């Protein structure tokens, strides 16, 4: 299945149903008073995280989602039916952005998590709501309010503990094949990896971590060179980055300059990502003598001003790979993810009263004090039905 990590969709919540103007008319009850019911609330639009999905490709074709409109009120104090909600399922790890405001509405990081992205309109009030001692035959009602309408950008970001970055052909795909069951394509030409991939590294029956492999970066990626930096977002949730350096590039390039290019592109993309823990890993040491590899790795680290520990491995022959994985596992155990407070999800509104409708009634009450209401029981009233529309 094609990997799609971005999609734009339009979500439109349902409008609220209009209130009804009606009067009770039954045999022997000629003046029964108002009995117009309220409209129904409009349906909401929700997003729900689903661990069984791993791409946003469905939303490249289906881009518009509309909830149902609330039904209008009816006579006999009948309230209109509430509009049906719409639930859109997205992969776990999806970030939701309102393109109109640039606001990040939420991150879908857990299976079953729900996020309200468009609220349905409030229902309108029937004329029963406007009756009073001075207005016994109210001919006012309110219309339902429009539902929310948003253009959303969905960004899928992989959930991994460890992220790998480096130049093309640094050996990232070979590494993930060596430590997990993932089988990304491996070849002797640049940009073999075109989409991100995940692998689960199992150290024993109880300990494991997830590693993410993204396409290689080249100089100018921040300006769109190569595959650009669009895949760097998949590393934002990683706890540690493994910076793989080809210790002896086949194209004769300078490993020090290659490493500086990667660091520079990280800083251009995000200071937060550049500040994440980053480990230096020299790959392909099997292509030279052990002593020569150690001396070259030391000189590269010194040229980069690297003061921490670094690793020498060969992903192809798995030399030094196991020790690196155990150190990563230890780091993950010692640095658990901070348990951020979960944002409270908006509860489903069961309407009883709200500021909008209270304002409508207050306005009518104020008018009643300033004007002498006509008691419209006279049969010769030819003014017809009076409507007051409020938005």
Swiss-Prot record:
PROSITE patterns linked to this entry: G_OBG, GTP1_OBG, OBG
UniProt-listed Enzyme Commission number(s): 3.6.5.-
An MF annotation (GO) of this entry: GTP binding
Binding residues for Mg(2+): 173, 193
Cofactor: Mg(2+)
Pfam families xref list: GTP1_OBG, MMR_HSR1
Stated family: Belongs to the TRAFAC class OBG-HflX-like GTPase superfamily. OBG GTPase family.
Stored Gene3D superfamilies: GTP1/OBG domain, P-loop containing nucleotide triphosphate hydrolases
Protein name: GTPase Obg
Family annotation (HAMAP family): GTPase_Obg
Subcellular locations according to the entry: Cytoplasm
Gene Ontology biological-process annotations: ribosome biogenesis
Region named Disordered: 127-147
Lineage: Bacteria, Pseudomonadati, Pseudomonadota, Gammaproteobacteria, Enterobacterales
Polar residues composition-biased segments: 129-145
Family matches, as SUPFAM superfamilies: Obg GTP-binding protein N-terminal domain, P-loop containing nucleoside triphosphate hydrolases
Swiss-Prot/TrEMBL keywords: Cytoplasm, GTP-binding, Hydrolase, Magnesium, Metal-binding, Nucleotide-binding
InterPro entries: G_OBG (IPR031167), GTP-bd (IPR006073), GTP-bd_Obg/CgtA (IPR014100), GTP1-OBG_CS (IPR006074), GTP1_OBG_dom (IPR006169), GTP1_OBG_dom_sf (IPR036726), OBG_GTPase (IPR045086), P-loop_NTPase (IPR027417)
GO cellular component: a single term: cytoplasm
Boundaries of every OBG-type G domain copy: 160-333
Chain residues that bind GTP: 166-173, 191-195, 213-216, 283-286, 314-316
Subunit structure: Monomer.
Location of the Obg domain: 1-159
């Amino acid at each position: 299945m094609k990997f799609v990590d971005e999609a734009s969709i339009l979500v439109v919540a349902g409008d609220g149903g209009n209130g009804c103007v009606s009067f009770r008319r039954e045999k022997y009850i000629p003046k029964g008073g108002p009995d117009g019911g309220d409209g129904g609330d409009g349906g909401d639009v929700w997003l729900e995280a689903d661990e069984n999905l791993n791409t946003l490709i469905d939303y490249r074709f289906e881009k518009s989602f509309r909830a149902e409109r609330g039904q209008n009120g009816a006579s006999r104090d009948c309230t209109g039916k509430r509009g049906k909600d719409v639930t859109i399922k997205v992969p776990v790890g999806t970030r939701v952005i309102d393109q109109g405001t640039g606001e990040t509405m939420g991150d879908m990081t857990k299976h079953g998590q729900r996020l309200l992205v468009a609220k349905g309109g409030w229902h309108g009030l029937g004329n029963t709501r406007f009756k009073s001692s001075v207005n016994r035959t109210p001919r006012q009602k309110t219309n339902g309010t429009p539902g929310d309408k948003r253009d959303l950008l969905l960004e899928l970001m992989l959930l991994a503990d460890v992220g790998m970055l480096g130049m093309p052909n640094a050996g990232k795909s070979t590494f993930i094949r060596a430590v997990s069951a993932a089988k990304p394509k491996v070849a002797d030409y640049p940009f073999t990896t075109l989409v991100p991939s995940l692998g689960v590294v199992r150290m024993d029956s109880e300990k494991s971590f997830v590693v993410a492999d993204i396409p290689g970066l080249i100089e100018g990626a921040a300006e769109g060179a190569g595959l650009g930096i669009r895949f760097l977002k998949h590393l934002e949730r990683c706890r540690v980055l493994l910076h793989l350096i080809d210790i002896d590039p086949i194209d004769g390039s300078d490993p020090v300059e290659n490493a500086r290019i990667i660091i520079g592109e990280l800083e251009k993309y995000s200071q937060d990502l550049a500040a994440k823990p980053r480990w230096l890993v020299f790959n392909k040491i099997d292509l030279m003598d052990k002593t020569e590899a150690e001396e070259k790795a030391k000189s590269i680290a010194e040229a980069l001003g690297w003061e921490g520990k670094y690793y020498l491995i060969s992903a192809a022959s798995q030399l030094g790979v196991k020790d690196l994985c155990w150190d990563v596992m230890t780091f993950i155990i010692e640095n658990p993810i901070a348990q951020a407070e979960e944002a409270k999800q908006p509860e489903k509104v069961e309407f009883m009263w709200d500021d909008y409708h209270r304002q409508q009634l207050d306005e009518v009450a104020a008018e009643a004090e300033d004007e002498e209401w006509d008691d419209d029981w006279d049969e010769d009233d030819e003014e017809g039905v009076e409507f007051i529309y409020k938005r």
